[in-house]
Amino acid sequence: PVASPKNMVDQYYGIARNHDEAQYFANVTNLDAAVGKLLKALKSMNLDQNTLVIFTSDNGPETLLRYGPRSGRSFGVADPLRGMKLWTTEAGFRVAGIMHWPARIKPGQVSGEVVSALDFLPTFCDLAGTKNPENLKLDGTSFLPALEGKGMKREKPLLWVYYSALNERRVAMRAGKWKVLARMNFPKTKTINQKNVSQAKGATLSEFQIFDLSQDIDESKNLAETNPSKLKELQNTMEIHYRELVNDSHVWE
């Protein structure tokens, strides 16, 4: 992690179990202080009331000791969610999403809308009063209605295809309250390149699981067998959007 000032690390000795945990706690404190400086700067320039500030993360807590015994600073937890970073279960990508915009957002609200970083570009286009780029097929949806207390209308479900995920079902989809996981019949790999891209794009899905996250946030009750009609519906939806995503994907080298 990013190194923190010594005085911040020192304040956690006696509280933390060891030096590495003190470093982790100091990192969190340092991040909080940095966000505070940003908000204070906006206020000093009289920009705080009409500036949208978004605080979020790119993934869940670091997987324990992923880099071996020397990486002793993996102290984040995501209970009661299942998994951690590098998983396609909820703990892999369900993260904090805090938005501050006093002129437009009533403080203290909690929204149940599902929002992704994929939604940033269409939202910012919406805020700027412009249209999404016509030459781009965007997977996200503007969440401006959610900021105004209205419901979002997401035309496409959110889809994750993670070739090197640590769990076995490396493709995930979120459609409303439903979560779908599926196996990808393609070997785990960290890189998609010209040598394996054809095989990757031809990979099929199997062994689908479905979960009602409104009742089962830790994804412990697979409803595939007890709700076959919903399984078929969600499986078909995932297949369509999975194929669209992999066919439109580029190889970056």
What annotation goes with each model-predicted range?
Residues P1-Q23, E62-T63, Y67-S71, H250:
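Active-site His/acidic residue clusters
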Residues L47-V53, R94, R154-K156, A175-W178, ...:
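Loop/turn elements at helix/coil->beta-strand transitions in domains of secreted/extracellular proteins
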Residues N18, A22-T29, S111-L118, K137, ...:
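Soluble non-cytosolic domains of exported or imported proteins
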Residues V28, V35, L52-S57, A96-I98, ...:
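Beta-strand elements within well-structured catalytic alpha/beta cores of enzymes
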Residues P1-Q11, K43-I54, E90, L159, ...:
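Active-site regions of oxyanion-processing enzymes, predominantly non-cytosolic
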Residues P61-T88, I105-Q109, E113, L118-Q209, ...:
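C-terminal cap/loop subdomain of S1 sulfatases and analogous C-terminal strand-loop tails that border
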Residues D216:
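Intrinsically disordered, low-complexity polar regions and short flexible loop motifs
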Residues N30-P69:
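Metal-dependent active-site segment of extracytoplasmic phospho-/sulfohydrolases and closely related
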